[in-house]
Amino acid sequence: MNNMINIEVEKIIDPTPASDGAGVKLKRSIGVEPNYYDPFLMLDEFGSENKDDYIAGFPPHPHRGIETVTYMLAGSFEHKDSTGGQGKMTAGDVQWMKTGSGIIHSEMPAMNDGKLHGFQLWINMPASEKMSKPEYHYIDSDKMSTHKDKDKFIKVIAGKFKNSEGPIKKHNVDPIYFDVELNESKTFNHQVPSTHNSFIYLIKGEIEIGNNKHESVKDSPLILLSKGE
């Protein structure tokens, strides 16, 4: 335990307003600057209560050699792809897609109005897997492992926290993907392998990381972390 290194804030990135698909408005925090944060290629937050910001969706488009991870917090999207994979995502659901040698898919709102909110993360695939067969994994919120105590509630999408293990396993980068809700003035600790690049996306509130408190961290910033354990 004495050899453990505290993880500290390396950089704070304010998301850039952008649009994608057929005009869906979003905030992009990875994929704007030229710096490559291996293996992460892009991170978008999409969210609005105005249907005009999302109703046109993401019509059929191709991907190759990457993984896309979509996590819904509110609203619903319907996915269809060229492998025959399809599913309707609602709040709390996750879609993890390995595009491999290539796939064409669409993501369209399955709602006419109301609040839509979620995230999409792109992960680079290693050269040895870029021509692999595409895979589509739909993970229902009810099947997600969770951890709850008096201080926090954690949804484990990938990786392991205490006795809760995420459904994404046997992955080339051993991903850790948690949705963490902390009660006020409480603490979250987790060991991250020193080989991992890691980040926090603060959806709401204020957090203290390592030995430094960042009073100005608000409005959905991306917080890149130093390597440690």
Regions found by a protein language model. Name each.
Residues 125-154:
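Long amphipathic alpha-helical segments that form oligomerization/scaffold cores
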Residues 19-73, 144-189:
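A short glycine-rich, His/Asp/Glu-containing loop-to-beta-strand
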Residues 80-98, 187, 192-193, 198-201, ...:
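Short acidic-glycine-tyrosine-enriched beta hairpin
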Residues 100-129, 214-216, 226-229:
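Ligand-binding loop in jelly-roll beta-barrel domains
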Residues 46-113:
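Extended, compositionally biased flexible segments
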Residues 2-27:
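Hydrophobic alpha-helical membrane-insertion signals
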Residues 62-77, 122-126, 177-183, 195-209:
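Short, conserved beta-strand element in jelly-roll/cupin
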Residues 87, 93, 105, 117-119, ...:
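Generic beta-strand structural signal
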